[in-house]
Amino acid sequence: MIANLPEEAYAIVEGRHADPFRYLGPHQENDRTVVRAFLPEASMVDAVDEHGGTATLERVHDAGLFVGLLPNGSGRYQLRARFGETTVDLDDPYRFPPILTDFDLYLLGEGTHQRLYDKLGAHPLTLDGVDGIAFVVLAPNAQRVSVVGDFNFWNPRRHPMRVRGSGYWELFVPRALAGDHYKFDIIGPHGQQLPLKSDPLAFAAEMRPDTASVVVDPARLSHPRPAPPAINALTSPMSIYEVHLGSWRRKDDNQWLSYRELAEVLPAYVRDLGFTHVEFLPVNEHPFDGSWGYQPTGLFAPTSRFGTPEDFIALIDACHRENIGVLLDWVPGHFPDDPHGLANFDGTALYEHANPLQGRHMDWGTLIYNYGRTEVVNFLVSNALFWLERYAVDGLRVDAVASMLYLDYSRPAGGWIPNKFGGRENLEAIDFLRRFNTEVYAKFPHATTAAEESTAWPQVSRPVEYGGLGFGYKWNMGWMHDTLDYISKDPIYRKHHHGEILFGLQYAFSENFILPLSHDEVVHGKRSLIGRMPGDAWQRFANLRAYYSFMFAHPGKKLMFMGCEFAQEREWNHDRSLDWHLLEQPEHQGIQALIRDLNGLYRRLPALHQLDCDGYGFEWIVTDDADRNVFAWIRKGNDARARCLVVANFSPSVYHDYRVRVPFPGKWREVLNSDSAHYGGSNVGNIGEVQTLDQLVPELSLSLPPLGVIFLTPED
């Protein structure tokens, strides 16, 4: 070992050099080209130029630091290294040009690079005729970042990266391959060694409990075929089947179905029941099964639990072949503090807030994104665009929006920090959501976004230019809570809660609403929907049939969690399949048949969907019959005769000669009756059609089934 090495040499050997290109690789010294290479465990290294000339490099440090001159002065070269009895020709990663352009760095610096996924992460690349992988990661406060993986025996001294403007670290690793596992080895700002970090922009990851990122070649990801462009329009029917991929169905040994196995059965099932969309609970990589995906660590990676990115594309493609739109639950509000993830990524609060009064979610123990950082907002917006572009999904439903909007969300007095105006609104989160929606709709005008927002925040689904947040839809949590509270009560008490049904129409058109019967309503001791229904067995199923019919007749798009369509008895359990054996029982078959017919009617009748989000499309007919628990209303479409009369009887009594006024004289056909024997009901109804009693003041005399809802349309 030569004694008088420069400090930079020791920094390389000790794995703490922040800019290894300044010392390693080729360097002009006078008229000569000096090559320096650090190859731990190598006993001998030669530099071999493109003409075959060879020069032996001198070992100047026992750790594996070699120095010498290029044989012909300059040009391309390889390193021929001897490891024990094996000789290997290597391309020197420190002879290649930068990966990020000056324009990339400019956009990254101002937080407007809209395609982070094309630059950051791991990307196959050919430089100077050499194939390899380009690695880029943000770590502005790190002293040193190395990429470690299968290609270097996970040795952090082997491939230290160089830092570019704004704290982006990069390195091209020759001969690294798609399929290689990798992580980032980071030394923090105070010299502290951090846990190995997964790539925030990795396109794939190992199966938990392992946490390495996996190199994916984006060129191998075929683009799914698109869904019909009008599938998300406000005037189109939208009936969403919400699915947790790990528990919809399972194999006999309780193992998951893969993405490709799901592709063979799920789209056909959804099509058969008449749903227009599926919505997947988060598919992003996540370490904890019990989070259901809502605590993701890999926002750009579909979870490896069910297969590869190519396999997930096959599932999306299968849905699109059936003209089924695909929506993803998306979680930009918080992330877990697992040591391999985003938390304390570069030894500082890079993605989160440093102050726990701002940065930690009290309910979930997770960390909250710092929307005041341009890098964080750029990361999240790019992720949204990534799923819409690369996977051709049709929309994103944003989770837990209320927790993003309010600084005091679920916090005690004194446990939060006001905004600059002294208020509780998270101004940076508002700006982020507006930018997210603006960029999504600008680039994907046929896509949609939906907000799970549980407060009365105004204009969630109104355009940004009019002061709104810019979402396409908002979940109507108030409707869900009020109506479930009503229907779960014994009918004898419902007259005292008549307003819970009426109240929803006071605000039904203030937003573009989705009526959600989601996974959150069938867990944590709430019981299944059928489990909430009062009465004996027959009444429970009749109540549920009436409630579902009421939902499909109510203004707003529809969402139903898996299992609800056949009256799953148990609460949902993410660790096991739905109870498909229940479909051997007639009453459960009846619920499923009703959902199929409700979806069919909803899609077929413009009156039930065209004006879901427009007050012109709804008119109350009966609101004052609380004693008999009866409601009636008209749904309207754009055409003058596109009308549907809906009468709901939430009493177990049968009412004959019940008079209801209608807009047109003549015959009205009973197009659906939730009490039909086909669905398990008592078959009380109107024998298919009813004639108005008076031509001047048209009125129908109806038989109202017990705990039933009927739909009638005028005959042409």
UniProtKB/Swiss-Prot annotation:
What reaction does this catalyse?
A: Transfers a segment of a (1->4)-alpha-D-glucan chain to a primary hydroxy group in a similar glucan chain
GO molecular function terms attached to this record: 1,4-alpha-glucan branching enzyme activity; cation binding; hydrolase activity, hydrolyzing O-glycosyl compounds
Active-site positions on this chain:
399, 452
- A Pfam family of the record is CBM_48
| Pathway assignment | Glycan biosynthesis; glycogen biosynthesis
GO CC terms = cytosol
Might you name a Gene Ontology BP term for this protein?
glycogen biosynthetic process
Keywords per UniProt = Carbohydrate metabolism, Glycogen biosynthesis, Glycogen metabolism, Glycosyltransferase, Transferase
- CDD domains annotated for this entry? AmyAc_Glg_BE (cd11322), E_set_GBE_prok_N (cd02855)
Documented EC number(s): 2.4.1.18
Q: Which family does it belong to?
A: Belongs to the glycosyl hydrolase 13 family. GlgB subfamily.
Per the entry, what this protein does is: Catalyzes the formation of the alpha-1,6-glucosidic linkages in glycogen by scission of a 1,4-alpha-linked oligosaccharide from growing alpha-1,4-glucan chains and the subsequent attachment of the oligosaccharide to the alpha-1,6 position.
| Subunit structure, as described in the record | Monomer.
Q: What is this protein called?
A: 1,4-alpha-glucan branching enzyme GlgB
Give the species this sequence originates from. Rhodopseudomonas palustris (strain BisB18)
Specify the taxonomic lineage: Bacteria, Pseudomonadati, Pseudomonadota, Alphaproteobacteria, Hyphomicrobiales
This protein's encoding gene = glgB
